[in-house]
Structure formats: C-alpha cells, structure tokens
UniProtKB/Swiss-Prot annotation:
Sequence positions that bind ATP: 178-179, 203-204, 260, 282, 291
The protein's name in its UniProt record: Probable tRNA sulfurtransferase
Reaction it catalyzes: [ThiI sulfur-carrier protein]-S-sulfanyl-L-cysteine + a uridine in tRNA + 2 reduced [2Fe-2S]-[ferredoxin] + ATP + H(+) = [ThiI sulfur-carrier protein]-L-cysteine + a 4-thiouridine in tRNA + 2 oxidized [2Fe-2S]-[ferredoxin] + AMP + diphosphate; [ThiS sulfur-carrier protein]-C-terminal Gly-Gly-AMP + S-sulfanyl-L-cysteinyl-[cysteine desulfurase] + AH2 = [ThiS sulfur-carrier protein]-C-terminal-Gly-aminoethanethioate + L-cysteinyl-[cysteine desulfurase] + A + AMP + 2 H(+)
Protein localization: Cytoplasm
Record GO terms (molecular function): ATP binding; CCA tRNA nucleotidyltransferase activity; tRNA binding; tRNA-uracil-4 sulfurtransferase activity
Keywords, in A-Z order: ATP-binding, Cytoplasm, Nucleotide-binding, RNA-binding, Thiamine biosynthesis, Transferase, tRNA-binding
Protein family (similarity comment): Belongs to the ThiI family.
Leader peptide range in chain numbering: none
InterPro entries reported in the protein's UniProt record: Rossmann-like_a/b/a_fold (IPR014729), ThiI_AANH (IPR020536), ThiI_fer (IPR054173), ThiI_N (IPR049961), THUMP_dom (IPR004114), THUMP_ThiI (IPR049962), tRNA_STrfase (IPR003720), tRNA_sulfurtransferase_ThiI (IPR050102)
Pfam families: ThiI (PF02568), ThiI_fer (PF22025), THUMP (PF02926)
Domain THUMP: 58-162
Pathway: Cofactor biosynthesis; thiamine diphosphate biosynthesis
Organism of origin: Thermoanaerobacter sp. (strain X514)
Tagged with keyword Nucleotide-binding: yes
C-alpha cells in the first residue's frame, strides 16, 4: 500500500483539443513545485494526475496548494487488487472522520476483478464500520464520500483539500506588472498569474527620495509571488531625474497623471524587449485621483500595448483580504515610501483632458529619459 495524492483540475477539462497542452503544463508546474522532493513521482493515467509520495505528504500538499490549475487535492491509497488491502486502506483513510456519516462509491473499469462495484462497496463499508468508531452510513447526503477505483491497481480516497484553482502558469503568455510596493499591484500580478499569465515586474526607484528599503520591499514581494510557480525578473528603473523634470516643469495638477504616463511608456519598452504582450497595474476604479475613468483613459493613451487591471471593480477591503490570503499584505504595509507617494500635488486633476495633458508634457524633454533610462535587473 502506498500513499498518493490525486490531483483534481477544473477548467482544464473544458479545453477541448487543447486539453493535453494544459494538462502537460500543469504536470510540468507540479514537478517544478516539488523539484526538491527526491521521493516524489508525478504521472498522468486514465485522465488523472497522481503524485506518489514516500516522504512528508503534508509538506507536499502545502506546495501543491500554491500551484495554479489545481482545484482539489485528495489523499489516496494505492493498493494491490486484494480486498484485504483495500479494506486496510479504507479504514486508515476514515480514521480521521469519526462521528461523521459516509458512503462508499466504487468504480470498476477493470472487469476482471471478481467482485462487482456494489459488492466492493458493501464489503468496504462493512470493514470500515467494524474498525472505525462512531461512523454511520448515509447513502443520500454523506459527510464523507469514500471512493474505491478498481483499475490495474486499486485506488482508495476520501475528502478533498481545496486548491488554488485557475489555469496552469504559462498557458496564457507573458505580461509585465508595474509593481509599486503597495497593497494593490502584487495582488493584481497574482490574479493574472492565476489566469495562466507569466509575469515580469517593473519597479520605479527614485533615490534619494525613496530608500533602499523600499526597493527591498518590492524584492520581497517578488519572492512571495515566485512561490506560486515561477522565478520573477524584476526590472528596477531609476526614475529620479524624470520625476524631478515632471515636478519642475509641468503644472502641479497634472504631475501625477504625467508621471503615470511616463511609467507606462518605459514599462512598455521593457515589456516589448522581453516578450510581454500586455501591461498589468493594480488600479481600482475611483480609488484615488489617478484612477478615475478619465485619468485611466489618459493613461491608456500613452501606450499601444493592452493594460490589464484585474482589480478594477474591487473594493479596497476585498483587495486587502486577498493580499492577506496570498501573504503579500504584511510586506506591502512596511512604512517605506515609493516614488508614487513623493511630490504628490495638493489638488490633482481628477478629470484630465488628454489634449491638455499632452500639451503640459511638451514643457519638458521627456523622450531622452524614456530612450535612455537606467535599469537594474534582479531575478527572484
């Protein structure tokens, strides 16, 4: 008898002709997540993905809970085609469910097995009732469904541990996220990763107005995001000179929106150079002055690349809840200013007109900064 995990996936099963592509990518991502477990084996048989574990199964489960594309993880036992072994496996699995109701459900694709599905279910149920205290059978609405599958081997499993869901990372191209160090942008990156998008990150650094600790905070956020399946390339752009140019030469009410437009232009250049097909931001409609629908329209007009804003309809409390769930919140609230919080005007324009903003931009020579920005690349 061997402990294994049965991996359940949702949307992948709906992908038609591309199903094998998604399944193979998921298997590759599972192997990557478990690469330092020498005793783990991953395989796909009968349309199922199995993970065989000889070591710490709980630690393996914790890793798998961060693999996008997995909707459920089920602890299972693989045994020989022997009723006594099947009974033993069923009893072990049900020992954690005392006081509950259960039902046994058997599938028997292997028709050479001498007992039919009903007989296997009946015998397994009797063995469980005999050896596990305080259990009752409920065939209509059981607390626990105990499954038995009779194939070339027998598989016995019960209960499901919730996975993270989504699509396997790497199945939907690559995008570049503008990562500020605040609460919102890492959540936006995570949400796009959940839809199968690989991400790179751009952080705008403005020393001496922003400290090295602010940059370290962004590096730490990338480390957390990388736990969900990929190493993240962080592009640190030195933004001080361009930010001072904006502050000194542009009307105060437009400095925030112009700064956002310059960031977009630089991020687009980095994205194009590195094979990204879109930008990602953590903007939520109406949250601050630069996130009104008019401001977002003006920001969009600065680039030709699509801009994804997965948080656009979320409340701040919803964003914070998700940040706490994915373990970025405590890092994001470290008290170190980023470049978006310096030189903030008292009365920023909330309904800027594109032509007025472009006119204001002409007061400075911004193109030389965009063409010759200083960049540091950190792989996390």
């Amino acid at each position: 008898m061997q402990d294994i995990l049965l991996i359940k996936y949702g949307e992948l099963a709906l992908k038609g002709d591309n199903r094998s592509f998604f399944e193979n990518k998921l298997i590759k991502n599972i192997k990557h997540a478990l690469s330092d477990f020498k005793e783990v084996k991953v395989e796909k048989t009968h349309g199922r993905i199995y993970v065989e574990c000889d070591g710490d199964i709980e630690e393996v489960i914790e890793r798998l809970k961060k693999v996008f594309g997995i909707v459920g993880i089920t602890k299972a036992k693989k045994t020989d085609l022997n009723l006594d072994e099947i009974f033993k496996a069923a009893v072990e699995l049900m020992k954690g469910h005392e006081g509950k109701t259960f039902k046994v459900e058997t599938k028997r694709p292997n028709k050479s097995f001498p007992y039919n599905s009903m007989e296997v279910s009946r015998r397994v149920g009797a063995a469980v009732l005999k050896n596990v205290k305080n259990l009752k059978v409920d065939v209509h609405n059981p607390d626990v469904l105990l499954n038995v599958e009779i194939r070339e081997m027998a598989f016995v499993y019960a209960g499901v541990i919730e996975g993270i869901g989504g699509l396997p990372l790497g199945t939907n191209g690559k995008a570049t996220v503008l990562l500020s160090g605040g609460i919102d942008s890492p959540v936006a990156a995570w949400m796009m990763m959940k839809r199968g998008v690989e991400v790179e990150a751009v952080y705008f650094h403005s020393p001496p107005y922003t400290s090295e600790r602010a940059k370290d905070k962004v590096v730490d956020l990338c480390k957390v995001l990388s736990q969900y399946g990929q190493r993240i390339k962080l592009h640190v752009v030195h933004f001080t000179d361009l930010q001072l140019e904006i502050y000194e030469k542009c009307p105060p009410k437009f400095t925030t929106i112009i700064m956002r437009r310059m960031m977009m232009k630089i991020a687009e250049k980095i994205a194009q150079k590195n094979g990204s097909m879109a930008l990602i931001t953590g903007e939520s409609l109406g949250q601050v002055a630069s996130q009104t629908i008019e401001s977002l329209y003006v920001t969009n007009a600065s680039v030709s690349m699509p801009i994804f804003r997965p948080l656009i309809g979320m409340d701040k409390t919803e964003i914070i809840d998700l940040a706490q769930k994915i373990s970025t919140f405590e890092i994001s609230i470290r008290p170190y200013e980023d470049c978006c919080t310096i030189f903030v005007p008292k009365h920023p324009a909330t309904k800027p007109k594109l032509e007025k903003v472009i006119e204001a931009e002409q007061k400075m020579e911004y193109q030389k900064y965009i063409d010759n920005f200083e960049e540091e690349v950190i792989e996390v």
